Amino acid sequence: MSVPSATAVPGGRANVRRGSRAAGRERPAGSSATAGYFFVALYVGLLGLLGVAPVVYAIYLALSNSRGFGSSFVDAFDDYRFVPAFEHILAFMLIWLVAQTILVVGLTLMLHNLAQRVGAVFRFLFYIPGALAGAASVVVWLFMLDPTASPFAFVLHWLGYAQFNNAIAPGNLAPIFAVMAFWTGAGGWIVVMYGALNNIPHELLESAEIDGANAFKTAWWIKLPLIRKWIVYMLVLSFAGGTQLFVEPTVLGSAALGVGVSKYWSPNQLAWFVASQYDNFAEAAALSVVLLGLGLLVAAILVWRGRLFEAE
């Protein structure tokens, strides 16, 4: 009777060891689910505390007025500063959103056609200004707009601005704030758009090149449609942030000692002004609700027209 010989499997023992280590590294499914529930609960809790609750309270303040239901909105609409504040913010956002959309998408498409290392260097350079956000960015621009201290003083003098107050004349404020917003925010969106372009299958781009499509046709007919949702996403967040413009005109107005920049240039500033100077929290809440409604309306239109949540 012959005894069957054991056949050695090359690397079998090593495979067993690797398998045992892999099994040891596996986490129970319950722990992953618990962690997921924890982070979702944390997000929902913070959203309710810092997002939903203030909105509900603002609506309550705006509607509960001793002079009658909705009188706070009437006061806000009748305020002589209401229309100019919204004209300012709409002019600013029109300049900023159009310029940001065209330049961010254009620069991203250009960087995507460059060599990997060269594109990485430019993405980093574009992203650097985003590190100076808020008041820090405005302080930088205080020097940039001062003809006596700016490194671009020759440009300011060429435009006819001999003093700081000339540069920040009321008619220049909307473009100035648009440049500030683009300076701090464009780099981050370029990185986001570049990541979206990298998700396009390389085979699709090769097929277009084989079919004779040049760089412009590839960008227009293939790349842009495939990153359309990211462009809409950028517009939604940018519009929501733009309606809340506050720091830039406040700091710039303080530096100019109130000359050229009013204390209620933007609706957000106006809401703060009536609340802090007149203790009229109901009107301030009404202005906040108007800004919220405007943001939600524009976001809904962009999401609907851009088919942001449709599966492809």
Tell me what each language-model feature is.
Residues 32-312:
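A structural signal for multi-pass alpha-helical bundles of membrane permease subunits
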Residues 1-31:
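Short, Lys/Arg-rich, polar N-terminal cytosolic tail immediately upstream
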